[in-house]
From Swiss-Prot:
GO terms for biological process: NAD biosynthetic process. Pfam families: CTP_transf_like. PANTHER family: NICOTINATE-NUCLEOTIDE ADENYLYLTRANSFERASE-RELATED (PTHR39321), PHOSPHOPANTETHEINE ADENYLYLTRANSFERASE (PTHR39321:SF3). Belongs to the NadD family. Pathway: Cofactor biosynthesis; NAD(+) biosynthesis; deamido-NAD(+) from nicotinate D-ribonucleotide: step 1/1. The gene is nadD. It comes from Neisseria meningitidis serogroup C (strain 053442). It is an enzyme of class 2 (transferase). This is Probable nicotinate-nucleotide adenylyltransferase.
Amino acid sequence: MKKIGLFGGTFDPIHNGHLHIARAFADEIGLDAVVFLPAGGPYHKDAASASAADRLAMVELATAEDARFAVSDCDIVREGATYTFDTVQIFRQQFPSAQLWWLMGSDSLMKLHTWKKWQMLVRETNIAVAMRQGDSLHQTPRELHAWLGNALQDGSIRILSAPMHNASSTEIRRAGVSDGIPPAAARYIREHGLYEK
C-alpha cells in the first residue's frame, strides 16, 4: 500500500527546518512521497508576507532535490478559506487506496479539536506529530484525551522522534535571508526582492 505524507504550511518562507522535519517524516513513517501544500489563505494564521505564487515557487525550488518530495497548489487555487479536512478529501479521491499521513507540529495538535470536522479528519488520515521543544502530550486538551489514547494504541498517530526545528519563518523574515533558507529559495528571495525591510 502506498504511503503519502501531507505537509501543509504557510512556508513564508520555506526554511531548512521544514526540509529537515519532512525528511524525518518520510524516514520514520516509511513514506513513498511527502506532498508540500503551501497555504492559500491560512485559516489559523495571520496573512502571509509573500504572495501565494512566490511561496509556491520557493517551495518548488527548495524541494526539487529530494525525489520523495512533491508540491501541490490545491490549497492555493481553492476559493475562500482552506481547511485541512477538505485538503485530505482531495487526496483521498486522488489516491483511494493509499495510506495518508498528515504532519503537524505539537502546537497544532493542542488545537486540533478547534479544526473544522476534526473528528472526521482523524478517520480519513493518520497523524504524525513533530514535538516542539517544551511541549508534552500531557498538555493535550481534555477534548482530545479519549481520541489520543485510542490513536496512540492503534498507531493512527505517531510522535516523530525528530523534534520540530527551532527556526521559524517569522524569525527568518525579521532577521533577513540567512543560512536557514535552502540556497535555491534564498536566491529566489533575493532576485524578487522579497522580505525587504
